[in-house]
């Protein structure tokens, strides 16, 4: 997860990727305020689903549980750092 990924939203401007959720789905937040969160689905075209901060937190925590079960430590540690920085 060492790569930083950005995406330009037509209304909210530059978004920063928080994490990959599953195939073709990633969680993004607004770059500066980190108050708006979007679940972005990429299946030929981009679809943005607005999430509340608490829903975004649940998505990240669910992904951390999944990584823990799969034993993917490096990505888990990076996501724990992002979780702490973003939600605490």
Predicted regions and their residues:
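Long, non-catalytic architectural segments outside compact domain cores
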Residues: 1-55
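Short, compact, well-ordered microdomains
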Residues: 52-88
């Amino acid at each position: 997860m060492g790569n930083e990924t950005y995406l330009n939203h037509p209304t909210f401007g530059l978004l920063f990727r928080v994490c990959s959720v599953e195939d073709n789905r990633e969680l993004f937040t607004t770059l500066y305020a980190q108050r708006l969160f979007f679940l972005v689905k990429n299946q030929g075209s981009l679809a943005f689903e607005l999430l509340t901060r608490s829903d975004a937190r649940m998505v990240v925590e669910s992904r951390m549980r999944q990584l823990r079960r799969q034993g993917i430590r490096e990505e888990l540690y990076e996501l724990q750092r992002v979780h702490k920085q973003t939600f605490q």
